Amino acid sequence: MLPPTIRISGLAKTLHIPSRSPLQALKGSFILLNKRKFHYSPFILQEKVQSSNHTIRSDTKLWKRLLKITGKQAHQFKDKPFSHIFAFLFLHELSAILPLPIFFFIFHSLDWTPTGLPGEYLQKGSHVAASIFAKLGYNLPLEKVSKTLLDGAAAYAVVKVC
């Protein structure tokens, strides 16, 4: 049997590992070499980076392309990908979705209506919304439907613009 090889950045180096039992070779284990972890298999050692929830192989084409584009930030993402994704989702909820009902409540309670809107579009939208509410079983007056629709649209516009 040939000794296992190790690949780092496309270079192949030979590494002699003491003999192991077949059970250990099948399970696979990690060895420490120059402060890096390598996954042992009988034929090839591949460098892997482990986080608490996920393992990303560092020899994939996508990973190499990402390293060229982002550099230092990609290494930080590589160590803890799920924490970065969770932080993005949390900040998105905090900055985009949470202000929507707050602005809607402010516009609805202050009875504010934006000026300069074409009346024919508001009337057409109010009739469509009133027919949808009627199909759902809500019999609301047309004026209340148009006010609610206008407050929702204004809140959405403020959140998206700001």
UniProtKB/Swiss-Prot annotation:
Task: Mark the transmembrane ranges.
Answer: 85-105, 125-142
Cite the residue span of the transit peptide: 1-45
Which InterPro entries does UniProt cross-reference here? Mrx11 (IPR018811)
- Report the source organism: Schizosaccharomyces pombe (strain 972 / ATCC 24843)
Q: What GO cellular component is one of the record's annotations?
A: mitochondrion
Q: How does it sit in the membrane?
A: Multi-pass membrane protein
Q: What does this protein do?
A: Component of MIOREX complexes, large expressome-like assemblies of ribosomes with factors involved in all the steps of post-transcriptional gene expression.
Record's family? Belongs to the MRX11 family.
Q: How does it assemble?
A: Associates with the mitochondrial ribosome.
Q: Which stretches of this protein does UniProt put in the Mitochondrial intermembrane compartment?
A: 106-124
Task: Tell me which PANTHER family the record gives.
Answer: MIOREX COMPLEX COMPONENT 11 (PTHR28002:SF1)
Q: Which domain of life is it from?
A: Eukaryota
**Record carries keyword Transmembrane:** yes
Where found in the cell? Mitochondrion; Mitochondrion inner membrane
| The protein, known as | MIOREX complex component 11
Q: Which gene encodes it?
A: mrx11
Q: Which UniProt keywords apply?
A: Membrane, Mitochondrion, Mitochondrion inner membrane, Transit peptide, Transmembrane, Transmembrane helix
Chain ranges on the Mitochondrial matrix side, renumbered to this chain: 46-84, 143-162
Tell me, which GO biological process terms does this entry list?
Answer: mitochondrial gene expression
